[in-house]
Each structure stands twice: as C-alpha cells, then as structure tokens.
Amino acid sequence: MGTKESTQRRAQRVRRQIRKVAGERPRLSVHRTSKNIYVQVIDDAKGHTIAAASTLEKDLKGSLKTGADTAAAAAIGKLIAERATKAGVKEVVFDRGPYIYHGRVKALAEAAREGGLSF
C-alpha cells in the first residue's frame, strides 16, 4: 500500500468515527500543506460550508511570516472561531483528517477553543 492510499484510509477512518459522535454538530475540517493551512466549518446535513479561513487571505498574509508554522495555525484557529461564532456555531466536531494531532493541527485546535468553539 502506498502513501497516498494509507493517507486516504486514515482520513476515512477519522471521518467514520466523527459521523458516529457528531450528531447535529457541524464539522471543523483541517487541511494543511507544506506552505499553508486551511480550515472550514461544514454542515454535513445541509452540505454547505458555514465558515472558512486560510493563510492565503490577504489581511492575514501580510501579518504572518509564513503560512506554514504554528503561529499561523493559531491565527487561523482564532479567525475561524470568530467567524463560526458570528455565524451562530458554538459546538463543532474536530476533523483532523489524515493529520496527527500535533504541531500546526494542535495549535489551530487550541486557538479555536480559546476563541470560543467547543469540541
């Protein structure tokens, strides 16, 4: 089994567990690359995105040294918490995807919790 297949299997395993515990809560989905990090609050029942944020946004891009460090992830976590709260979402289910809960993913999650999201 190659790296791509194992990554996809890991992501599917995580999402399967999320579906079991989610209930009516939307999903806070994280995607990271070597240069940026992206996050969305997704309502799977309706099939649409409630809020989104990434390190590619112009107002953040100037203030961050790079989009690929824990400081950038923390800034995105605070921003998504602010946007989700503004949209009326307080509780979410954290979807780390195929990524381990460490480093940038952990920094984003902790900042989102500090910003007011509950998961």
Swiss-Prot record:
Superkingdom of origin: Bacteria
* One MF annotation (Gene Ontology) recorded for this entry: structural constituent of ribosome
Task: State a GO cellular component annotated for this protein.
Answer: cytosolic large ribosomal subunit
Question: One GO BP annotation here?
Answer: translation
Q: Which residues form a coiled coil?
A: none
Q: Which InterPro entries match?
A: Ribosomal_uL18_bac-type (IPR004389), Ribosomal_uL18_bac/euk (IPR005484)
- Please verify whether the record's keywords include Ribosomal protein: yes
Keywords recorded for this protein, A-Z: Ribonucleoprotein, Ribosomal protein, RNA-binding, rRNA-binding
Q: Which HAMAP family match?
A: Ribosomal_uL18_B (MF_01337_B)
Q: What role does this protein play?
A: This is one of the proteins that bind and probably mediate the attachment of the 5S RNA into the large ribosomal subunit, where it forms part of the central protuberance.
Q: What is known about its subunit structure?
A: Part of the 50S ribosomal subunit; part of the 5S rRNA/L5/L18/L25 subcomplex. Contacts the 5S and 23S rRNAs.
Q: Which family does it belong to?
A: Belongs to the universal ribosomal protein uL18 family.
Q: What is this protein called?
A: Large ribosomal subunit protein uL18
Which species does the entry assign this protein to? Mesorhizobium japonicum (strain LMG 29417 / CECT 9101 / MAFF 303099) (Mesorhizobium loti (strain MAFF 303099))
